[in-house]
Design a protein with these regions (language model features):
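A conserved short beta-strand within the histidine kinase catalytic ATPase domain
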Residues: 57-65
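Glycine-rich/acidic phosphate-handling loop/turn and adjacent ATP-lid/helix
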Residues: 73-100
């Protein structure tokens, strides 16, 4: 299997769900569609609101690489990336109904590895048969 590596640039959130569905279809990862869709929706939404401060003139860059059984995702915003970002291991019952704050937790739960380096979120997921 040849590695597939691409980059997509988007502005705002109007077309991100269609782009995500296109990535899943292009890579033939329909069996993992729920996980990948959830991961990318949360990462792109986080980049838009927190990195780009809801400015739809600033790009969000999504890079993806499928090599063998490993899917590598990068979501880069246009922010300064100076703050620290923690992917929580758990959320309390009180936080379950909060307006925000679950996105990073969900990314952590549905990926094998997630970290933020400056203004880029790096996410890794095994797409091997169970």
């Amino acid at each position: 299997m040849n590695a597939v590596q691409k980059e997509i640039r988007l502005y705002g959130l109007e077309q991100h769900q269609g782009i995500i569905d296109g990535i899943i279809q292009e890579l033939g990862l329909e069996d993992y569609a729920f996980d990948i869709r959830l991961i990318l929706i949360e990462a792109i939404t986080n980049a838009y609101y927190h990195g780009n401060l809801s400015d739809c003139t600033k790009p969000i860059i999504v890079r993806y690489l499928l090599s063998g059984k490993r899917l590598e995702l990068q979501v880069e915003d246009s922010g300064e990336g100076s703050g620290s970002l923690v992917f929580p291991e758990a959320i309390s019952g009180d936080e379950l109904l909060d307006e925000g704050g679950r996105g990073l937790y969900l990314i952590r739960c549905f990926s094998d590895k997630a970290e933020m380096v400056r203004n880029t979120m790096y996410i890794s997921k095994c797409v091997c048969p169970t």
